[in-house]
């Protein structure tokens, strides 16, 4: 298996059993294809996750990431792939936090929520870099407060 940076459009087209022309009809390059792929994960998460509980949102996110462990690890070894994955995480985390606060996706996170989102983002990236050995539920229990009241208090203190 190759790291994403070394995968060519020819490799992707061959694996998908389509012609390169067909690939280029839909995508301008492999990074646009990766962006689309990550957006599909986001839609999958949104459909799968009707919860307003932030910890359940995070558990679902970690489960999806771990389910696609090999792909995620290969994506993170390269600047552009890492950047796209990081953007995906930012969007997902912001949406989860807003939803758990009963806000719209278009609303802006307050400072406490931004601080929390950046911290969670860093923890997830570190977990990915270390090979995702901890089960998602164990990672959450080690990392986050045992109640969402603590998180709500953090949001309101800023």
Predicted segments with their positions:
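Amphipathic alpha-helical packing segments from all-alpha helical-bundle domains
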Residues: 56, 79-124, 145-148, 152
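Amphipathic alpha-helical segments used for helix-helix packing
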Residues: 36-38, 60-93
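An amphipathic alpha-helix adjacent to DNA-recognition modules
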Residues: 5-17, 24-51, 59-62, 66
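Regular secondary-structure segments
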Residues: 42, 46, 66, 120-132
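Short helix-capping/hinge SLiMs at alpha-helix to coil transitions
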Residues: 1-4, 130
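Short, solvent-exposed positions on alpha-helices
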Residues: 36, 83, 111, 134-138
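Arg/Lys-rich, alpha-helical DNA-contact motif
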Residues: 52, 56, 70-73, 96-97
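C-terminal peripheral helix-coil segments that are non-catalytic and often amphipathic
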Residues: 126-158
